[in-house]
């Protein structure tokens, strides 16, 4: 037996978290275009960190040393 809800709106506001509070300023700028490079610098940093992470995983998988730092 199925239950049909007549009220389609939700009354709960949701949970407020620390991470949500920290990220809220980023969401408030949604849809706006930043002048110049915008957030390309942040994206470059995260892409570089991700590439380093993948290199470390590849080193572990191959049991070799790609970056020999001495």
Swiss-Prot record:
Bilayer-spanning residue ranges: 40-60
Primary location class: plastid
Topological type in the membrane: Single-pass membrane protein
Descriptive protein name: Photosystem II reaction center protein H
Superkingdom: Eukaryota
Entry similarity comment: Belongs to the PsbH family.
Gene Ontology molecular function: phosphate ion binding
InterPro entries cross-referenced by the UniProt entry: PSII_PsbH, PSII_PsbH_sf
Protein's cellular compartments: Plastid, Chloroplast thylakoid membrane
Keywords per UniProt: Chloroplast, Membrane, Photosynthesis, Photosystem II, Plastid, Thylakoid, Transmembrane, Transmembrane helix
Subunit structure: PSII is composed of 1 copy each of membrane proteins PsbA, PsbB, PsbC, PsbD, PsbE, PsbF, PsbH, PsbI, PsbJ, PsbK, PsbL, PsbM, PsbT, PsbY, PsbZ, Psb30/Ycf12, at least 3 peripheral proteins of the oxygen-evolving complex and a large number of cofactors. It forms dimeric complexes.
Pfam families attached to this UniProt entry: PsbH (PF00737)
Biological role stated in the UniProt entry: One of the components of the core complex of photosystem II (PSII), required for its stability and/or assembly. PSII is a light-driven water:plastoquinone oxidoreductase that uses light energy to abstract electrons from H(2)O, generating O(2) and a proton gradient subsequently used for ATP formation. It consists of a core antenna complex that captures photons, and an electron transfer chain that converts photonic excitation into a charge separation.
GO terms under biological process: photosynthesis; protein stabilization
């Amino acid at each position: 037996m199925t239950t049909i809800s007549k009220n389609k709106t939700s009354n709960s506001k949701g949970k407020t978290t620390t991470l949500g509070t920290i990220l809220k300023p980023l969401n408030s700028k949604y849809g706006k275009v930043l002048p110049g490079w915008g957030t390309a610098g942040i994206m470059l940093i995260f892409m570089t960190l991700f590439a380093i992470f993948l290199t470390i995983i590849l080193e572990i998988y191959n049991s070799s040393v790609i970056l020999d730092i001495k």
